[in-house]
Amino acid sequence: ALDKFREFHDTAACGSGSIFQSMNSTVTMNLACLFRLRGINLTASAACASGSQSVGLAYLLVRDGLQDCVVCGGAQENNMYSVAAFDGIQSFSVREDEPTRASRPFDRDRDGLVPGGGAATLIVEDYDSAVRRGAPILAEIVGWGFSGNGDHISTPNVEGPARSLELCLEHAGVTPAEIGYVNAHATSTRIGNAREAQAIARFFG
């Protein structure tokens, strides 16, 4: 659209749909139209944490009585442009001869992540709502924590993830000893894994 604008010097050349192709909220707006959803509609944009943040926000909306039910999730599309731009920060593994062993989170020989795409969707809802519609209840969300680094946009520190863990445990009312599984970010990058491991060790030893 911008190329056409530069060529013709006329905004009409952009087309009436170009603005919607540039907004990340278009995804959730389209889904709401497809499924006739009338509730709160927003797109969480928080880099790798976007999907987790959407689940956390859904939990808060249901917990506080603003929604009975929320469709939430996350998606990552892989294409030449997104991968090329991401590779600019030199975070990808260079083990191209070992693609199945290239991703080595928390390994001393790690050298970066392996790009991938995918999507997942969850229905987060009030217990009474789930029972009423006969939904299979797979899990209960009891707490959530979210915190940013606050000092660098791409280089993580220890305090950001540690604060997230602290808030999650505090809001859930559970102790580290009661946790049986931690789903780490685990980028396999030198600095990222080291800082994340320090944050996890602060609470789980």
Language-model segments: residues:
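Conserved small-residue
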Residues: 31, 51, 58, 86, ...
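Residues on a specific face of well-ordered alpha-helices
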Residues: 25-29, 33, 56, 60, ...
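Acyl-CoA/ACP chain-elongation machinery
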Residues: 66-111, 144-158, 184-194
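Short acidic/polar capping segments at secondary-structure boundaries
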Residues: 37, 47-50, 75-78, 128-129, ...
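Beta-strand segments within the central parallel beta-sheet cores of soluble alpha/beta enzyme folds
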Residues: 41-46, 67-75, 136-144, 177-184
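Condensing-enzyme catalytic core mediating Claisen C-C bond formation in acyl metabolism
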Residues: 97-174, 180-181
